[in-house]
């Protein structure tokens, strides 16, 4: 039996609708709108697309969005000074610095400079630490979106063996913490992992976030597994994931498509986090 599709497109619409509804409620009470500052350094085409989609979502939902498109020559100190100003701005609840940054700018230093209460990307060590301590506040958008997708399957996550392919700070590592919090037994694989196939084959829940097209053959998937494909790769003009979708969907019980799976959830959770930050500041 073919896998059931987990649609991020549909779920993200519901989440955005709920966020917009809450914002309208606050506005009707005479309160200000939530504010999000979006900073883009340089003119990377992919980053421009992502930033554009975030700004459009803000407009749709009633979030006040302030844009800062900085030239590639911007120095690290100039960026840190801007972030400090935004940290002090009472109209701004969330600060988003689009990654990757130019090589000469230390992204870790930049992330650490954002006030933890305005870190709507959920990357600040304080917020990652809270998740690690099982008291999360602002959580990384993609892993949080994946947890929302997993909820829609109705599968009890307690005791499930979750395998994560990729150990990035943006997806893999916070994803491991989210799944631990949900009661899973978690394995994280990375570039030094030996016998990747055997790890994949043991996964009740498989999260793949590598950024390499079709790196996971469908035949590796365990019968009945839930497959979450975070990868977005362009091959011959088409967007494809990190998993061989056609084969994997014959073995999995649930699977996310690419596009229309995890991607829309990342932006939806950014809007959700911005509302959360606004509520904490109010």
From Swiss-Prot:
Gene3D superfamilies: Leucine Dehydrogenase, chain A, domain 1, NAD(P)-binding Rossmann-like Domain. Keywords: Amino-acid biosynthesis, Histidine biosynthesis, Hydrolase, Methionine biosynthesis, Multifunctional enzyme, NADP, One-carbon metabolism, Oxidoreductase, Purine biosynthesis. Its EC number is 1.5.1.5, 3.5.4.9. It holds the Pfam family THF_DHG_CYH_C. One of its GO terms (molecular function) is methenyltetrahydrofolate cyclohydrolase activity. CDD domains: NAD_bind_m-THF_DH_Cyclohyd (cd01080). PROSITE patterns: THF_DHG_CYH_1 (PS00766), THF_DHG_CYH_2 (PS00767). GO terms for biological process: L-histidine biosynthetic process; methionine biosynthetic process; purine nucleotide biosynthetic process; tetrahydrofolate interconversion. It catalyses: (6R)-5,10-methylene-5,6,7,8-tetrahydrofolate + NADP(+) = (6R)-5,10-methenyltetrahydrofolate + NADPH; (6R)-5,10-methenyltetrahydrofolate + H2O = (6R)-10-formyltetrahydrofolate + H(+). Pathway: One-carbon metabolism; tetrahydrofolate interconversion. NADP(+) binds at residues 166-168, 232. GO terms for cellular component: cytosol. It comes from the Bacteria. Homodimer. Catalyzes the oxidation of 5,10-methylenetetrahydrofolate to 5,10-methenyltetrahydrofolate and then the hydrolysis of 5,10-methenyltetrahydrofolate to 10-formyltetrahydrofolate. Belongs to the tetrahydrofolate dehydrogenase/cyclohydrolase family. This is Bifunctional protein FolD.
């Amino acid at each position: 039996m073919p896998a059931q599709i987990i649609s991020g497109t549909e779920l993200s619409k519901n989440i955005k609708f709920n966020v917009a509804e809450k914002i309208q409620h606050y506005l009707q009470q005479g309160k200000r709108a939530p504010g999000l500052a979006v900073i883009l350094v340089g003119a990377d085409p992919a980053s421009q697309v992502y930033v554009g989609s975030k700004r459009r979502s803000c407009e749709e939902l009633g979030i006040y969005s302030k844009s800062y498109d900085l030239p590639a020559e911007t120095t690290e100190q100039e960026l840190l000074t801007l972030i400090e100003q935004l940290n002090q701005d009472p109209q701004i609840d969330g600060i988003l610095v689009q990654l990757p940054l130019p090589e000469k700018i230390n992204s870790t230093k930049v992330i650490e400079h954002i006030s933890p209460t305005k870190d709507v990307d959920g990357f600040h060590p304080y917020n990652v630490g809270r998740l690690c301590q099982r008291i999360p506040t602002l959580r990384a958008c993609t892993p949080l979106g994946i947890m929302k997708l997993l909820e829609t399957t109705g599968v009890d996550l307690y005791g499930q063996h979750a395998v994560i392919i990729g150990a990035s700070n943006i997806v893999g590592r916070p994803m491991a913490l989210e799944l631990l919090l949900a009661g899973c037994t978690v394995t994280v694989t990375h570039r030094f992992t030996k016998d990747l196939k055997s790890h994949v084959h043991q996964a009740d829940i498989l999260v793949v976030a590598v950024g390499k097209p079709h790196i996971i053959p469908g035949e590796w998937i365990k019968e009945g597994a839930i497959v979450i494909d975070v990868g977005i790769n362009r091959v011959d003009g088409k967007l494809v994931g990190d998993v061989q979708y056609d084969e994997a969907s014959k073995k999995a019980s649930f699977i996310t498509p690419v596009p229309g799976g995890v991607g829309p959830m990342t932006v939806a959770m950014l809007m959700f986090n911005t509302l959360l930050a606004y509520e904490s500041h109010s």
